[in-house]
Amino acid sequence: MLKILIPTLMLFPTIWFSPAKWLWTTSIAQSLVIALASLSWLKWSSETGWSSSNLYLATDPLSTPLLVLTCWLLPLMVLASQNHISPEPLNRQRTYISLLVSLQMFLILAFGATEIIMFYIMFEATLLPTLIIITRWGNQTERLNAGTYFLFYTLAGSLPLLVALLLLQNDSGTLSMFTLQYTQPMHLLTWGNKLWWAACLLAFLVKMPVYGVHLWLPKAHVEAPIAGSMILAAVLLKLGGYGMMRMMVMLDPLTKELAYPFIVLALWGIIMTGSICLRQTDLKSLIAYSSVGHMGLVAGGILIQTPWGFTGAIILMIAHGLASSALFCLANTSYERTHSRTMLLARGMQMILPLMTTWWFVASLANLALPPLPNLMGELMIITSMFNWSHWTLLLTGLGTLITASYSLYLFLMTQRGPLPSHIIALEPTHTREHLLITLHLIPIILLILKPELMWGWCF
């Protein structure tokens, strides 16, 4: 664990003491080396699955893929931000990259924590850098409104969790993930325990987010700069799913009784957000709503508590993280050239930037879960396990898949095909930086299907 944490910490002096000319190059190079070093986590070899450097930080097959995804994303965020942050004053550029690095530190500590209270503290700590990135570097003035939504939704959702954790500490005397799975704190079906169950899961349902408490997400995504959108879509939403999986072990007998409304809400959300996507005019908003739909499927897979559901949820979280981050990067390349997020004002791009269209096509297909990609594997495992749980869910998940395919193709056709508007005839060509950025997103998706056991948790 420290072989990643210490180099990440050493990124701060790199950022603040590098000369202006080399700031971006050194930051990207060092963070890419850290990302490559983090791949060594995937080779875990212990009987329990846990491999711990000490009592407080450990990795297991559930957290490892998410840790590697976090490390992989930092160089990509810095790479994506270079164009629109580099004209700013030097100290502001340094502050921006430092915020991204601190976010990575908090996320590594959150996914690596073995004490639930430490996980909670890091879960909350990720709020601060994200909030600063949205409210300081967002594009429009609505960013303050978006930041407020983001802050209050997340805080209001996670305060009951803090109370629940303190009660649990008082009751069982420990909050360590190693021991809590052997103590069953909630074997009585009393009203107090039911409220406690809801408090434990509410924070994660808001963070995922499940349909109904999702209003902060489109606002935050639309107003955030590119790095904010990428980290939010790729890793911060996954904190919710990861937290739910960790807490599910303890909440056992109650979940079977109380999870029904949340499963229905999650599945209904897939159809509702898909329908909302079909009538979006704003590019980033469409991608943000599609994230809510995919996370609804993940929530359903986790709440039915079957090994296949858990496995499908982990795979879909990783695959969706890379695919939606790639889509946000592509939306940003379009926005930097046309200065508009409205799809009608930036269409027919295939005429001018044909190679970008190829990237758009691959990313859209990854989003709609085309066969060779892990997105399909995750979705199929969740849909199959839900079908075994109740046959009626097939109506909702099947319709959701159909709508997902529809809006993904609608997104591709609206941005890339059709007549070219007269005001965007002369656009600057694509840079190697942008091609590298999208390649580093899409290559892991394509390669992961060759060795999916890296990310399917304990079920092997």
Curated annotation (Swiss-Prot):
InterPro entries tied to this protein: NADH4_N, NADH_Q_OxRdtase_chainM/4, NADH_UbQ_OxRdtase, ND/Mrp_TM
Record membrane topology: Multi-pass membrane protein
GO molecular function: NADH dehydrogenase (ubiquinone) activity; ubiquinone binding
One GO term of the biological process aspect: ATP synthesis coupled electron transport
UniProt entry keywords in alphabetical sequence: Electron transport, Membrane, Mitochondrion, NAD, Respiratory chain, Translocase, Transmembrane, Transmembrane helix, Transport, Ubiquinone
Transmembrane regions: 20-42, 61-81, 94-113, 117-139, 148-168, 195-215, 225-245, 258-278, 285-304, 308-330, 351-371, 394-414, 436-456
Keyword Translocase: yes
Pfam families reported in the protein's UniProt record: Oxidored_q5_N, Proton_antipo_M
GO CC, alphabetical: mitochondrial membrane
Subcellular location: Mitochondrion membrane
Reaction catalysed by this enzyme: a ubiquinone + NADH + 5 H(+)(in) = a ubiquinol + NAD(+) + 4 H(+)(out)
E.C. number(s) listed in UniProt: 7.1.1.2
Similarity section: Belongs to the complex I subunit 4 family.
Protein role: Core subunit of the mitochondrial membrane respiratory chain NADH dehydrogenase (Complex I) that is believed to belong to the minimal assembly required for catalysis. Complex I functions in the transfer of electrons from NADH to the respiratory chain. The immediate electron acceptor for the enzyme is believed to be ubiquinone.
UniProt-recorded name of the protein: NADH-ubiquinone oxidoreductase chain 4
Gene source species: Salmo salar
